[in-house]
Amino acid sequence: MKKLLFLFLFIPIVSAGQKLMPYITTKSPITLFSTQDGETEGIWSFSVVNPYDFKLRAEDSFTVIHLGTDHPPIVKTVYGTIATSIIGTPSMAMSSDGHYGLVTNHNWRGFDFFDKLIYPLDESISPEEKKLNKETIYQLSNMIFVVDLENSSHPVTHKIHVDDVPVHILAHPDGKRFFVLGHNHFFTYILKNGKLFELAKSKIPYGQGCFWIHPNGENIVASRSKDWKSEVTKAEWFKIVDNKVIYKHEIEIDSSVDSNYQIMGGILRISPDGKKALISQRTYDNGIDFADILIADLTLKKPKITDVIKQVGDGIESFAFHPNGKMAVATCLEKRKNSLAVLDISSDNPRVLYYLDAAGGSQGIEFSPEGDKLFLGSPAHGRIEVYDVKDDFKLSKNQKFIKIGYGHNSLSIGPRYR
């Protein structure tokens, strides 16, 4: 009888304190913006075929996902109104109010391995002719697209051609500006009523890769190579002066660190406190050996690689930092049965704590603002996987996931626009 009484007393407490919903919820209203590259099937599934005759049939797409406290995910995938490439970065940009998503597309394919598709005939049109035709979407174009994330039809509100190879776009911490990295320039834009306006174009040394903006709003770390296939990818330090970006120096590896730069790197992320950057030693050319995570100390007057987490995965694709400042995660790049590395970055000895199962080729990865959820996008399986955060270092994979278009290549997170 006493046990039965205890049970009845306990049930209301659990129900009131942690009401379980039969769908994915978040502690506050948020929006996820996932982009998908139609080339992914050709690049991954048939890459060993030579000669290659796969024709590009799948349209690029994006998926908008609204999550909240009291409703199932509101999800819509739109095909054929943007172009985007899986060659490059797993993150793009969102306006600070969550109203607009921004994504780049480019014609860089790295090397022949990624360039075996037969494109539609209109791809033979010159860049100058493409710019004159404002309505056509070209797979091999250098463009930026702005998408309305709140309008239920999610129209493209603006698209512009760029005189460079725009691999990556990120929002500045000031919540107003956006920075775009090309091979030869940084571009600075401001967004007004869904349209981009260029503020500056900054000449920089040539390089192929990605970047991250320091939370101080005054510096940038990029990870770039002169030739992604044959020359090592190195981290670089930049300074933002007004709207211009100025190259400062290469970020050297301290002699005490047992690691080095390798070819085919390029992915990195700066911690929210601005003290460190996690840098992928190698993303691609899988099946060789395990790649390291290089750790840059950004508190130094001249930032330097001062630490390393050895042999994390056969290619490291993306990073996310938990709001607690103790835990970070890194996605590995196995194509089918994949891995998520959970990292302890709080101690003097950064390390891998454990691995969790992840869908193939994981790209974009983001924690929810409160840190109770982790979202991970998979191009191979067309889904956003969800992990629940239990404590400082404990993640568990949720059996529920969010369905998106095939070929996921980037994930952005922000507030729900009101």
Identify the residue ranges that each predicted region occupies.
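Predominantly soluble domains enriched in secretory-pathway, periplasmic, or organellar proteins
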Residues: 18-418
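Sec-dependent N-terminal signal peptides
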Residues: 3-12
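Sec/Tat signal peptide C-region and signal peptidase I cleavage site
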Residues: 13-17
